[in-house]
Amino acid sequence: MREYLTEHIKQALHKASIPASRAIKIEKPSDSRFGDFSTNIALVLAGECGMNPRQLAQKITENLSFSETTVSKTEIAGPGFINFYLEPAFIMKQVEQIITSSDRFGRGAAGEGKNAIVEYVSANPTGPLTIGRGRGGVLGDCIANILEAHGYTVTREYYFNDAGRQMSILSESVRLRYIELCGIAVEFPETHYQGDYIREIAAAILEKHGEKLVESDSTELFKQTAETHIFTHIKNTLHRLDITHDSYFNEHRLYQEDESGISPNQQVIDALRQKGFIDHYDGATWFMTTRLGQEKDKVLVKSSGEPSYRLPDIAYHVTKFERGFDEIVNIFGADHIDEYPDVIEALKILGYDTDRIRVAINQFVTTTVNGETVKMSTRKGNADLLDDLIDDVGADATRLFFIMRSKDSHLNFDIDLAKKQSKDNPVFYLQYAHARICSLLRIAENEAGFSLEEGSADAHLMGKLTSAHEIQLGFTLLDYPDVIQTCARILEPQKMVEYLHSVAELYHRFYQECPILKADPDIRSARLILSLATRQVLRNGFRILGISAPKSM
């Protein structure tokens, strides 16, 4: 509908000899008394045209030519808004396109021909996934789904941090536990990894190699074994939430030298030095962010020779540009808030178009039972494990609860609510709407011979639906493509959750107030078509969110 109205406004501007120099925005008023759609184009163009906004709005409306079967009324409101009131029959007849488009309904073309990379999870392979990482994983997976629905070709990537100090600590942790299992007392530092999984890895090494590694000075075997074991576990956990990746970028590649003997990390330092943004003092290599107005420079290479997180992150992002992605989306936890702006600044200095980078920060998660904060782990050394949460509430509840609040908001994950089999549980509420429609359609097919094909053929009957409940539901279903656009623009799947909840709420109300199977044949068919369309929108939305669409509950 927005495209339809936009095109007619463009034609009206052309007829009135008004240059359309600005984008035409069509919005839905928050109060239905002000129409089904509204535009502020007269307010936007008034200054350029040297006219009073209301006078300009009058001139535009005089040149609008709508069919009486589509737009019933156009009015000027306030300082110069133009409000449009659609014919209810026209709205309802559009519902047919939902059924004919099926799984394709809502898919856009804005990203056609463009490649996007979405990086998410990217947890260090030093232990099982935590709940916080899980929220970022679900957020990233949903955003990738949204961009695909928006027409993009999407690469889902995991940045595999297999280099640096944490990996050294991991390998040493396993080595010490291995020695301990060999019957030798060791002093295990508190700074090392404490979880039972470390002992499990050490036990596997002992079983395979015996005690011959006790005197070895090398930790490489311990590192490789731990890395393989932990990352396999991470991927299995993600698989439980139906989270997958197309590629895994290993951090160690950024330390590898090319034919000329220069690593990607060193290339970044050399390029920043040429731009005058590298300094060396206190034995370290510094990114001179004070030249950018910051209070302190940021270390890139520590005095120990170990790079800080910033250096490989900059080098990694350079590879994203070199791989030709049009859109670069990063899903970070709140612990990256202070770091990523420095990465952006470095990329700007190096000449990259950082407008192509979009960052989504997801805030922390706490879990509660009976209103009290709890830990989701019984394993010493690990707090809030994602596997334990999935075990407790299931994959669907885990996914939906992670995104039912804005990514910018701290999430209180209510375990009791997630396990409820009632309308209070948002997962149950949404899935029950889908199951209710499936049940209705089974009865309709068995008792009245209704089928999808017949429903599509009788779509003209939709114009017979005139009650407020029917029209509001139909109108809301047609919003689905706009919701996809909004989610893609702001990288916020929570908007899809809100929308689907409103669809379910409207359907439950329609179901209660408008008899379906006992209605006259034409009305019955039309209401079944409306139910089919609702089921399709719910299914498409569930696919975006990565939750199942049960046929019965």
Curated annotation (Swiss-Prot):
EC top class named in words: ligase
Top-level taxon: Bacteria
EC number in record: 6.1.1.19
The keyword Glycoprotein is annotated on this UniProt entry: no
GO MF entry, a single one: arginine-tRNA ligase activity
Keyword field contains Protease: no
GO CC list: cytoplasm
This protein's UniProt keywords: Aminoacyl-tRNA synthetase, ATP-binding, Cytoplasm, Ligase, Nucleotide-binding, Protein biosynthesis
SMART domains the UniProt entry points to: Arg_tRNA_synt_N, DALR_1
GO BP, sorted A to Z: arginyl-tRNA aminoacylation
Compartments in which it is found: Cytoplasm
Motif, 'HIGH' region: chain positions: 123-133
Recorded catalytic activity of this chain's protein: tRNA(Arg) + L-arginine + ATP = L-arginyl-tRNA(Arg) + AMP + diphosphate
PANTHER family: ARGININE--TRNA LIGASE, CYTOPLASMIC (PTHR11956:SF5), ARGINYL-TRNA SYNTHETASE (PTHR11956)
Description of how the protein assembles with itself and partners: Monomer.
Family the entry assigns: Belongs to the class-I aminoacyl-tRNA synthetase family.
Protein known as: Arginine--tRNA ligase
Gene: argS
